[in-house]
Amino acid sequence: VNGDGKMDENDRYGFTTHWNSATLNWSFAFDVRYIVKNAEGVPTLLPQSEKMADIMTKLYDFYYNGNRTLYMTDQLVSKLGYPSHDLAVAGTFEKNQTLFAALRIYVIDNLRNMEDPFAIIPFPKYDEAQTGYYTHVDGHAPLMILPKTLQQTDNAGIVMEALAYYSHELVVPAVY
C-alpha cells in the first residue's frame, strides 16, 4: 500500500492476530474436539485427527505464506510501541490497516472512539457441512474451580449462580 515493495506494519492486511489470540479459536470454530467422555463418563483425550492436521496446515499457510496476515510478534509489538499484543492488534484494526482482527472481548472497549463502524462476528465455519458457529471462553477469562475437598458445595453453587446471573444482567449489556 505504501509503495515500498515490502509487506510490513505500514501496509494493509486481510487479517491480524497474535500468538495467543486466534489459533485456538480456529479449532473451536471448526468444531474440533480434543476431549470426549468415554463409556464410563471419564474425559479422554482424542488422538489428532485428519481434520486437525488439515486445519493446522491451512492455518500455517494463512498466517505465514502470502501477504494476507499480519502476525504480531513480540518484536513488532515492541517496535510499534504497544504495551500488549492485544492492543497492537486493536490499534492496527482501529487504523484501518486490517479488515479482520482476532480480538479478545476486553479489548473492544479500546475501539469505542473508532471513526469507522465495526461489528463483532464469529470465526467462519470449517466447511458448508458444519451446522453452526462455535467459540469458547478465552484463556484470559477467569474461571472458578472448587477443591475436591469442599464440604459446602451447595453454598459454592449458589454463589457461582449469583455471579453468573449478575454478570449476565450487568456485564453483557455494558459490553454489547
Range-by-range predicted roles:
Residues 82-99:
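Short helices/loops that flank or line small-molecule/ion binding pockets
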Residues 112-175:
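Extracytoplasmic/periplasmic substrate-recognition and gating elements
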Residues 1-44:
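Extracytoplasmic/periplasmic solute-binding protein
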Residues 36-83:
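Glycine-centered hinge/linker elements that transmit conformational signals in sensory
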Residues 19, 103-108:
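Beta->alpha turn/N-cap motifs
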Residues 3-14, 67-68, 95-99, 114-119, ...:
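Loop/turn elements at helix/coil->beta-strand transitions in domains of secreted/extracellular proteins
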Residues 2-3, 61-67, 161-168:
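Sec-exported extracytoplasmic/periplasmic mature domains
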Residues 56-60, 90, 156-164:
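Non-transmembrane alpha-helical segments in soluble domains
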